Amino acid sequence: GVQRHLTLHRFRPGSEPMFPPIFAQYGTYHTASKAPFRRISFNDAMETYGSDKPDLRIDLTVQDATKLLSGCGFGPFEGNVVKAIVVTDFAGTRKQIDGLCAEVEVQSGNKGYWFRYDENGEIVGGIAKFVAPIKDEAVKALGLVPGCFVGLTAGKKLAAQKTAGVFRNKLGAFCPNHMDKEKYKFCWIVDFPMYEI
């Protein structure tokens, strides 16, 4: 009879070498990551990229900032999971930042927050007044360097992760130095839960 189930482990090895040349020849870009593709667990993908379909062309990652910021006095962070995306060499204007945050809210249904660690080593903009009193802790915990932008999301764990994933994608597309737009990068997401809580 016909085999009804094709497990990922059976499918992966034979199929991996087929993808890169097909995408390189017929896709928009002419470069694709070679087999074997990276394996990322569902939980790691959600924690690191905020998505179970991560765009690996973007070099930005999501960090957990709950311990650092949940008690900073900013209402939306209280009692919630807080996620952060640190973007070095960020040159966006206030108007552009507002635009990015608006896009994040439209796409995810949740607000994005932010602050900057400026060239003078000061916390400025967005929710800076809540973060400035813990500047030293923030610099250490998030690995901040002068001239960086920090995008923030908050909510129940899955909502904070997914909103951070949207924010990460928007920031990657906005910052050409953080996204390699001229290639395909493949991965396998493994160990999916049976359902999301």
Over which residues does each language-model region extend?
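Class II aminoacyl-tRNA synthetase catalytic cores and aaRS-like
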Residues: 1-197
